[in-house]
Amino acid sequence: VYPERLRAAIDAGWHTGKELPGSAGLGHVGAMKLISDGSLNTRSAYCSTPYSGIEPLTYGTLSYTPQQIEDYMRLATEHGFDIACHAIGDEANTIALNAVAATHAHGSIEHAQMLKPVDIPRFAELGLTASIQPQHAMDDRDVITRFWANPAGIPYPFRALHDAGTTLRMGSDAPVAPLDPWLAISAAVLGTESSDREPFQPEQCLDVHTSLAASTATGRDRLASGDPADVVLLDADPYAADTPEAMRAMPQHVVMTLLCGE
């Protein structure tokens, strides 16, 4: 639910987790999706330092004022909605985190592509999930050195967030990147799309265990009794995939998909 439609959703009795009619239990109302800034490639992600090599100087664009962001988060939280706040630039993330702290909102920051070091521990402190898209780092690695040459924050700080105790969830942001979880897992673990190229920020790479867990609905990489029987079976071992080519080929090894056990 976008902010401009939030009041109508509240009036209709919607809230996060409510089952959608006709979905047979497979569809539920999600979070309030608030897009606080733009993107790196368009130089519209809102940053605390100006973009490199651009005249006139630009810091990106904030879609709402900080007060509006706080007000929408408060309204959502008071009426049973989680928040999913798109924030890419470091200053947009600071503003989003400040709003969460002020409103006690719960949910996720989407993307979190550049963070000031001081903001990294705040995710865990505030109980927020960092919803990350590692394939974007592969798409952006060359652009980062061009537009974020002197950033105040750390771009794509996957390992730093994990080490600070943040709950990570990984996705694709499709159609921006292909709807393929193995691309994200490969990027997070190996930091490159090809064995012919050095990893990007290897100090921020994650292990396979963490990446697989962040790619599941349960947040674990092991099945447990009582889990939903939504399972993909492979005839190859992702823990043994030590090259991006091997990890990115995992869709070719799917032998069975179960949804609700069927």
Where are these regions (language model features)?
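Phosphate/diphosphate-binding loops
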Residues: V1-K33, G107-Q113, P117, V143-R169
